[in-house]
Every structure is written in structure tokens, then in C-alpha cells.
A protein has these predicted regions:
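Terminal low-complexity segments of carbohydrate-biosynthetic enzymes
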Residues: 3, 40, 58, 124, ...
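Acidic helix N-cap motif at the loop->helix transition within catalytic regions
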Residues: 22-26, 53-62
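Conserved donor nucleotide-binding strand/loop of the catalytic core
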Residues: 42, 56-95
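Short aromatic/hydrophobic "clamp" motif used to bind/position activated sugar donors
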Residues: 101
């Protein structure tokens, strides 16, 4: 019996998709080719973020022969727009059932074949998250490359963030981390690794391949008003939230004597 059908799900592979009709079929096939040889129970969760093309229809065509393939559709999507990556990831984490979640974009620029190496690195290091790093091999235009470098400088300055490529969506993490991230706020997907570290989780980086977009168009704005200014404001917001966070862990108090009292502890 195929690994994806036996036992509790270990790995969820999750990708948000907004108008990716030309990529979703190949995406599913590439994920299957990458994960099946790992011999672990898995599922694929695609988040349709308000697509106005045939993205959802093409996913549905694939589903009858693939019990491991699931699709969740975002609600309350603005007309002809998506809710954005942060919201889509937020919905995806709540739909995923695996102990671990591999995240990637649906545009095929992330290579699902990297997931196996990420799993091995997580096992070897004991890390809670493996963050992909495309900085050595980005297949983007000059504007986006320069924007990433500038963003990295500001993140290091304001957040002491040493992650080289926090904008790379290809990452592997424990699902519990995803459920604690404030992804219901726009723009927070850019700060997943640094936020995870702030929450006390360990993050390691792994160089990954980055492929040119094969079909469709980028969903990111390139102008200063679409990315630079909102990105700086998001940085300031994250810095403010970090300073305001307080521990919420608590231990229930009982009427039993404390351990040190029973053992004749300090008087």
C-alpha cells in the first residue's frame, strides 16, 4: 500500500496557489516524485487563495485518484485578489494534519526534491525548522534580488535576524510552530524564521535550488509602494510585538506538598 495511505500522517506538503492553473498539475506530480521514496505517510495540501482562473478546477480533477491530495479554498477573498501569502499559510497550517509541514510556493521555482534533504538535516541536527536559502542561486530579476539584500540588512539591524533568505518559502518545520506564528497578520510570512527563533525554536539553514518561473506571472509587486514601504512597516511591527510578548506558560497548582518541602527542603 502506498506510504501516503498508511498510518498517521507524518509529513504535510503545503503550498498556497493564486492563479497557478498552469503549474498545479506539475507541482503535485513533482511533490509525489520527491516524497514517495521517503516511505513516510504524507499528504499534499494546496491552498487556493482566491484564484480566478482554473486552478481549483485542475486540482479537483487530480483528487479522485489521489486520496492524499487535499485542497482548501480561502473565504472572504477580496474580488479578483488573493488574501496574501501570510493568510494562505495561516489557513494551510490549520488544514495540515502532519507532525511536520514542508512549505513551498506553487509556481515551481522551489524544487520539491529538496524536501528529503531537509528531513535528513532536521533529523541530524535536531532542529525544529530547516529554512531554505536561495541567495546563492536566485533566478529572479535584479529588482527583486536587490530588494532582498536591502531587506536582509534592515532585518539584521532591527531584529538581529541572521537568516540569509527569510523570504524563501521552501522550509520544513514542526506543525506546532506554524500554529503559533501570527500569520493572520499581513506580511508576517516574511518573518517566519526569526519569529520561530523568538518563540524558542531552533532554526538551521540549507542551501536550495531556485528555478525560473516556467508559467504564469509573479504575484509580487515590485514598486517601492508595494513592497519596500510595507516591508519596513512590517519590520517595525515585528520589533514592537517582540518587545510586548510575555510568556504564557503556566503550571497547575495542587494541594499536594511541593517536592522540596516533602524532602525537607530549605526553611
Amino acid at each position: 500500500m502506498p506510504a501516503e495511505l498508511t498510518g498517521p500522517i507524518v509529513l504535510s506538503v503545503m503550498a498556497p496557489a493564486h492563479n497557478e492553473q498552469d503549474n498545479v498539475v506539475a507541482l503535485v506530480e513533482q511533490i509525489e516524485a520527491a516524497v514517495r521514496p521517503l516511505h513516510i505517510p504524507f499528504e499534499i495540501v494546496l491552498v487556493d487563495d482566491g484564484s480566478t482562473d482554473s486552478t481549483q478546477a485542475r486540482i479537483r480533477v487530480l483528487m479522485p485518484a489521489r486520496p492524499h491530495l487535499r485542497c482548501v479554498a480561502m473565504s472572504k477573498t477580496p474580488p479578483a485578489k488573493g488574501n496574501g501569502q501570510s493568510a494562505a499559510f495561516h489557513a494551510g497550517f490549520r488544514a495540515c494534519r502532519g507532525q511536520l509541514v514542508a512549505m513551498l510556493d506553487a509556481d515551481l521555482q522551489n524544487d520539491p526534491a529538496e524536501i528529503g534533504a531537509m528531513l535528513e538535516l532536521m533529523r541530524r541536527t535536531g532542529a525544529d525548522m530547516v529554512q531554505g536559502d536561495r541567495s546563492h542561486a536566485r533566478k529572479d530579476n535584479v529588482v527583486r534580488k536587490v530588494g532582498s539584500v536591502v531587506g536582509r540588512v534592515f532585518r539584521r539591524w532591527l531584529l538581529s535576524d541572521t537568516i540569509r533568505d527569510t523570504g524563501c518559502s521552501l522550509r520544513l518545520l514542526k506543525r506546532e510552530i506554524g500554529l503559533r506564528l501570527p500569520l493572520d497578520f499581513a506580511g508576517m510570512h516574511r518573518f517566519i524564521p526569526v519569529t520561530a527563533r523568538h518563540l524558542g525554536y531552533t532554526v538551521v539553514e540549507m542551501p536550495v535550488r531556485h528555478r525560473p518561473r516556467a508559467a504564469g506571472t509573479t504575484k509580487y509587486g515590485l514598486g517601492i509602494t508595494k513592497r519596500a514601504i510595507p516591508g519596513l512597516l512590517d519590520l517595525l511591527a515585528v520589533r514592537w510585538m517582540r518587545g510586548r510578548r510575555r510568556p504564557t506558560e503556566a503550571v497547575e497548582v495542587t494541594n499536594q506538598p511541593a517536592a522540596n518541602s516533602a524532602a525537607g527542603g530549605p526553611r
